[in-house]
Amino acid sequence: MEDEKAILALAALAQPTRLQAFRTLVKHEPGGMAAGDLARALEVPQNTLSAHLTVLSRAELVTSERHSRSIVYRANLGVFQKVALFLLQDCCGGDPEICAPLIESLQPRCPPNRKERNHV
């Protein structure tokens, strides 16, 4: 991942509503959430949320797809994974004794029966 893309993604998440929106979308994977439902869940006006989702979309952290009369947003876990790996690529000078606990703590906590979908 290039520095510029990582900076764009991290900057997009460096705002409370956008961070909360992204985390909510992660919780609703793999199905995503309709924009109106997400606005109600976050208790923000739809037009305000739309602006925030645009920022997250530009950073490629969320994707959107029209479903009938709704737009469904999903967290782009593939890009998020690239950002996390970018931040950790030189972790602890490569010392496995130091890195292992950190990497282990980053393992997904999803229920085992839930299908994981990684979309880019």
Q: For the regions a protein language model found, what residue spans apply to each?
A:
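N-terminal helix-turn-helix DNA-binding core of bacterial DNA-binding proteins
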Residues: 4-45, 70-80
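Beta-hairpin "wing" of winged helix-turn-helix
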Residues: 58-67, 74
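Short intrinsically disordered, low-complexity segments
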Residues: 15-16, 55, 88
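Alpha-helical residues within the helix-turn-helix
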Residues: 40, 57-58
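Residues within the DNA-recognition helix of helix-turn-helix
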Residues: 52
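Amphipathic alpha-helical dimerization/coiled-coil segments
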Residues: 1-5, 26-27, 77-120
